[in-house]
């Protein structure tokens, strides 16, 4: 069971920039964390109360527009930073050591590539509880749910990151025309996510042609560390993208 941290220990500020990329073996942690557990997090009461400049040196009066929910070790987040240098993307990760790794990774990338990767950051938080504390209504253009915890037991399905109640929150922070991207190697979870999102009145599923035309559809497959692992294990990958209407 994950040990609780004091509020100060849950700081989202990364350690001083390392001189080389961190190694994952020093940040190992269990694959998933209980989202219902009473962890301690720093979070703003209102989005206006949050100082995004602590993460993004050049953000100025701009806002974060991409959110990678459960960003893992940050592979896809880094890809977003490279593909969209003029957009600000945040990864939200509940696990302590994993979020520490992503923060240190970003700091190292910035130091090794001057002027780059200043548009991505990671925050340790529970997005299932505090998403609307960070984002205004209609703020986000894209949300990503890559290989979320499948919570296989039926009694734990209510903990899945895609459910009817949370979809209303995602709809709130997404702008009209904004997109939700999902990918998993678990067919049952894929069908669950598609069923719940398609049944929600705020969303419609993209056609196969629309998915293929999206510049990120291929990146969903192998940019993340989990995606690479599934590829190595020759597993299936199920992709679906949804638009807020």
UniProtKB/Swiss-Prot annotation:
Active site residues per record: 149
Catalytic activity: guanosine(46) in tRNA + S-adenosyl-L-methionine = N(7)-methylguanosine(46) in tRNA + S-adenosyl-L-homocysteine
Top-rank lineage group of the source organism: Eukaryota
Enzyme class, first EC level, given as a word: transferase
Entry binding sites for S-adenosyl-L-methionine: 70, 93-94, 126-127, 146, 224-226
Pathway field: tRNA modification; N(7)-methylguanine-tRNA biosynthesis
GO molecular function, one term: tRNA binding
The protein's Enzyme Commission number: 2.1.1.33
Subcellular location(s) of the protein: Nucleus
HAMAP family: tRNA_methyltr_TrmB_euk
UniProt function note: Catalyzes the formation of N(7)-methylguanine at position 46 (m7G46) in tRNA.
Family note: Belongs to the class I-like SAM-binding methyltransferase superfamily. TrmB family.
Protein name, per record: tRNA (guanine-N(7)-)-methyltransferase
Originating organism: Aedes aegypti
